[in-house]
Amino acid sequence: MTPVRPLRLLAYAVLPLEVVLVGCLIGGVRIPAVVLGVAEVLVAGLLLAEGLVYLRLRRRGLSRRDAVAELVPEPVLRLVGHELRLLASLGRWVARRPHGTAGADGVFPHARDQAALMYGFAFVCAVETVGMSFLLARWPVVHGIVLVLDVYTVLFVLGLHAASATRPHVLAGDVLRLRQAAHVDLRIPLDRIASVRRETLFSHEKADGELNLAVGAQTSVTVELTAPVDAPRLLGAPRPVRVVRVHADDPQALYRAVDEALTRARTAPSPDPGPPPRV
């Protein structure tokens, strides 16, 4: 057995215990110093062991990304990566720097129809933050923790919209890239597309093999594939799809661009095979 599996099992036991202890301390529960000391030693030992195994994996030739992937479960990595992408999207949104559009043949924003709803959510969260600050003013520890959580909630909601605003659908070369916020990034080769059509839908029933990237509860372009393409879920579970429905601020432009790209790809002349070999 490699040392990675025991470390993961230890982390699953130690980290929840640490969370419970923190919750007890916040709630005013008196915990013996011995218990706190043992918990801190376990956490420090776990971090030290993780660091040593990481160095060992690096010496075996693994890249930084691969070494971290060996130590940390994929769902945890994907969740952390998602949160980091949301925070990075806020910076891109302020700087007006869209993601993944360099060298694109077509860029198709899709966040306009959700903007009012997301701003409304952010406003409600901000009001709730102010209200909780007044209600918890007598309990400074609880007030501080709830304030951090509330502020992060506001940033999270704004980050969701910022991720959609800075990650448009992109047509580049022979690949159609369809995205939603920071959790869906689907690359479809044009030779996998059977058909594309302009189709506005406001209700979507869940079905195997279908992916609906609705914005404002609507989709406006439907892409059917000749073979399944994997669209991993948030935690990494595979999700093969053969029908993808998306929305764009200008759906006609997206439909026209994809349709024209398909026509060019299918009518392109075959390469010259060259002269026959001499016998």
Each language-model region and where it sits:
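Alpha-helical transmembrane spans
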Residues: M1-L57, D113-T166
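N-terminal membrane-targeting/pre-transmembrane regions
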Residues: M1-R8, L52-R138, P273, R278
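Terminal and domain-flanking low-complexity segments
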Residues: L15-V22, G37-L90, V223-V279
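Conserved beta-hairpin
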Residues: L57, Y152-R197
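Juxtamembrane/interfacial segments around transmembrane helices
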Residues: G61-V68, A88-V94, R167-R179, V196-E205, ...
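Alpha-helical membrane-embedding segments
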Residues: D66-V80, R96-G103, D174-P189, S203-A214
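Non-transmembrane, membrane-adjacent beta-strand/coil modules in membrane-associated proteins
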Residues: A181-R245
